[in-house]
């Protein structure tokens, strides 16, 4: 899992990376290079930061990670838990 500062450095360092906003059953997550963004306070077991809306996830990318590039949006299949919906 990536913290927000780590994600920001990663996106600045490698401009070819494109974040993915993963739409799960009742929330959205941001994935960069296969790693999820960690919440502000780590939980046990670790879970990705969850956003209630697509707009909130996109706003987080633009505001906190200062990212202005392309974004992939992928829906997760609730039966398999994968992005192959």
Model-derived segments and spans:
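Negatively charged, low-complexity tracts enriched in Asp/Glu with abundant Ser/Thr
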Residues: 1-12
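Flexible, charged surface loops at secondary-structure boundaries
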Residues: 11-14, 23-24, 66
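Short aromatic-glycine-(Arg/Gly/Cys) micro-motifs in beta-strand/loop hairpins
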Residues: 18-46, 76-78
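A short, charged, amphipathic alpha-helix used as a generic interaction element across diverse proteins
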Residues: 50-65
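A short amphipathic beta-strand at an alpha->beta junction
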Residues: 64-76
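Intrinsically disordered, low-complexity charged/polar segments
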Residues: 74-85
